[in-house]
């Protein structure tokens, strides 16, 4: 061995599966790509289509123009609504302006919208468990008249909620929160209102649950966990928190391989790697390559679940 060649320390890299894109994110990105193909550039997109900088930058390069509000888009160009969902007023405005619009709302989020309307039509008072200001929460609350949905962010909110008719209430949850995330609040609501109407089990986002369950098992056999995802991605932030709570010594959220601080690896022999639902697999591969370039790396996969779900594209793009 050449005297100048450093000794490469061994590292075991455990990949969580599933990780990265879920069916809703995959569909939303395809909608923007297909819209640019069909209608040419520019195609306007209201809000980040998904919360990932790399995805947004790539779509910008294809001809997508990201805007905050519909008023920023001209009447004669197509507009796409993000995967997080939008208030009812947004498609209503697009219709009034006779715009071509494509709704990339995740079908699981759309299910929550349908449930909200059903509860409202049945005269129930509704609480939504979620994070204030998150686009999905804004979209869900915007399905109904102002004041029809009360947002609950923590146990304090759940304890303080006083409906007019305690026997006629319902709760909904933000899809990027798992069963674990909401368990304490749901338990308190059920204790206070035994007859509260709850979401169907199949309406809970499979991707959020699967990715968090995978990270829990990853934490059992990793000293350090790296989560590939953007800081404004709710589900990515939660993956890091779940990893720490499940016993990982350290966990970090990184945009890509350039976000790695190599001092994190000091004294570490087993590293877990996962990605949020809006993070592309090529960024995960970039992290694997960066670690493999520095260490004698063995890669193994920890399979929590196999995901086969796909969602159909809007008819306008497939006709």
UniProtKB/Swiss-Prot annotation:
Coiled coil: none annotated. InterPro entries: LytB/IspH. It catalyses: isopentenyl diphosphate + 2 oxidized [2Fe-2S]-[ferredoxin] + H2O = (2E)-4-hydroxy-3-methylbut-2-enyl diphosphate + 2 reduced [2Fe-2S]-[ferredoxin] + 2 H(+); dimethylallyl diphosphate + 2 oxidized [2Fe-2S]-[ferredoxin] + H2O = (2E)-4-hydroxy-3-methylbut-2-enyl diphosphate + 2 reduced [2Fe-2S]-[ferredoxin] + 2 H(+). The active site is at 136 (proton donor). One of its GO terms (molecular function) is metal ion binding. Keywords: 4Fe-4S, Iron, Iron-sulfur, Isoprene biosynthesis, Metal-binding, Oxidoreductase. Dimethylallyl diphosphate binds at residues 51, 84, 134, 233-235, 278. Its EC number is 1.17.7.4. Gene3D superfamilies: 3.40.50.11270, 4-hydroxy-3-methylbut-2-enyl diphosphate reductase, catalytic domain. (2E)-4-hydroxy-3-methylbut-2-enyl diphosphate binds at residues 51, 84, 134, 175, 233-235, 278. Pathway: Isoprenoid biosynthesis; dimethylallyl diphosphate biosynthesis; dimethylallyl diphosphate from (2E)-4-hydroxy-3-methylbutenyl diphosphate: step 1/1; Isoprenoid biosynthesis; isopentenyl diphosphate biosynthesis via DXP pathway; isopentenyl diphosphate from 1-deoxy-D-xylulose 5-phosphate: step 6/6. It comes from the Bacteria. Catalyzes the conversion of 1-hydroxy-2-methyl-2-(E)-butenyl 4-diphosphate (HMBPP) into a mixture of isopentenyl diphosphate (IPP) and dimethylallyl diphosphate (DMAPP). Acts in the terminal step of the DOXP/MEP pathway for isoprenoid precursor biosynthesis. This is 4-hydroxy-3-methylbut-2-enyl diphosphate reductase. The lineage of its organism: Bacteria, Pseudomonadati, Pseudomonadota, Alphaproteobacteria, Caulobacterales. The gene is ispH.
């Amino acid at each position: 061995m050449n005297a100048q060649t450093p000794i490469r320390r061994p590292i075991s890299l455990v990949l969580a599966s599933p990780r990265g894109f879920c069916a809703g994110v995959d569909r939303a990105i395809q909608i923007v790509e297909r819209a640019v193909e069909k209608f040419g550039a520019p195609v306007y997109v209201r809000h980040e289509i998904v919360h990932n900088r790399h995805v947004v930058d790539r779509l910008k390069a294809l001809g997508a123009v990201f805007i905050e509000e519909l008023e920023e888009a001209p009447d004669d160009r197509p507009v796409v609504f993000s995967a997080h969902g939008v208030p009812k007023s947004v498609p209503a405005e697009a219709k009034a302006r006779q715009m071509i619009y494509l709704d990339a709302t995740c079908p699981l989020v759309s299910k929550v919208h349908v449930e909200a309307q059903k509860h409202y039509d049945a005269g129930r008072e509704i609480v939504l468990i979620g994070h204030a200001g998150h686009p999905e929460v804004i979209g869900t609350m915007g399905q109904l008249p102002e004041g029809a949905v009360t947002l609950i962010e923590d146990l304090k909110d759940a304890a303080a909620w006083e409906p007019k008719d305690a026997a006629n209430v319902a709760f909904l949850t933000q899809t990027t929160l798992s069963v674990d995330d909401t368990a304490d609040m749901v338990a308190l609501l059920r204790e206070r209102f035994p007859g509260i109407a709850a979401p169907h089990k199949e309406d809970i986002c499979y991707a959020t649950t699967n990715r968090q369950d995978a990270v829990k098992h990853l934490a059992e056999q990793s000293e350090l966990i790296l989560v590939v995802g953007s800081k404004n991605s709710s589900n990515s932030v939660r993956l890091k928190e779940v990893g720490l709570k499940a016993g990982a010594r350290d966990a970090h959220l990184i945009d890509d391989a350039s976000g790695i601080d190599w001092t994190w690896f000091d004294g570490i022999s087993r590293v877990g790697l996962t990605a949020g639902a809006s993070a592309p697999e090529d960024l995960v591969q970039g992290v694997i390559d960066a670690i493999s370039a520095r260490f004698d790396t063995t890669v193994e996969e920890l399979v929590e679940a196999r995901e086969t779900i796909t969602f159909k594209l809007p008819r306008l793009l497939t006709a």
